[in-house]
């Protein structure tokens, strides 16, 4: 069995996340695909996730991909959180997400005053209403009332500002975000927005998702996969990896069991430690994927500086694949203030590299840099 140290894992995973060197300009969709989508609860963070990995990223590239080229799609996905997914891969994600039991638990819907039967009726009406249309929540509620004849169901949709009631439609491939009008969010149906090819079977889709997760976030455990996916629990994760058979292999990471793609075993074993400094934004995919074993990539007792209350994940100063500090940025007129707070004294070379990244960020955001180091 292959035995790895966390130093090797950090280097290997950084390479898989394109954090050792940036991808060429124009690689935005390839990076989004490799990361299994971009976490987009905060859209600006999704943009900076790409900035940290793609050379010469255009500041407006994500907006154009979403609303003009329609090559990225914003929808609810893993863990019920907002993601940007490559449009060409939506059939895969919808097929896998449709197996999730996350929103099939009656207790969730009792809080909304809905039964599962009423939820299914509402979800079906949403799918019909959005076919070929782009609607605000209010317009969607009105159309749902027309289709169902139920003012009560329409009211449930209109009165809730939360996305929970819309997520079953998103998981089954019947809803995604359309372009907003001012501050008003709008929704549409993926098959009419981007065109949907035939979905793979649920079994094939879940196996592919598990394989792609390990390719980007491995070596990983059943628990890592279960947390990242957000449904099905440990039993579901075990079932998914078992489906891969010989495509995955057991490894030990500093004595702890994990799994890796079999084709990656030799590459990971022989991979050299990297020299790389990056400013990762809030909710970066690298940090999200490490949430269960972050203590191996962080100094002792500093987990709560990165993984904060209410699910907030701080921007991270990443050094050679390890989390060595946090940072933030603020716009102040025509200046960008970047505040770097390393967890300990950093070597001069790391300091220079971090300053270069901050300068690169200021250029990307079209501001002059004001850099502040704090203990």
Task: Please describe what each predicted stretch is.
Residues 84-90, 181-200, 257-270:
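Short, cationic-aromatic polyanion-contact patches
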Residues 67-77, 81-82, 171-180, 245-253, ...:
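A short, conserved structural fragment
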Residues 1-152, 300, 337:
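Phosphate-backbone binding and catalysis cores of DNA-processing enzymes
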Residues 243, 247-302:
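Non-catalytic regulatory appendages
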Residues 207-264:
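Active-site-proximal binding-pocket segments
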Residues 115-134, 202-220, 239-240:
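Positively charged, polyanion-binding regions of nucleic-acid-associated proteins
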Residues 306-375:
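Glycine-rich, small/acidic residue-mixed loop/short-helix segments
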Residues 65, 137-145, 169, 222-227, ...:
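A short acidic, leucine-rich amphipathic alpha-helix
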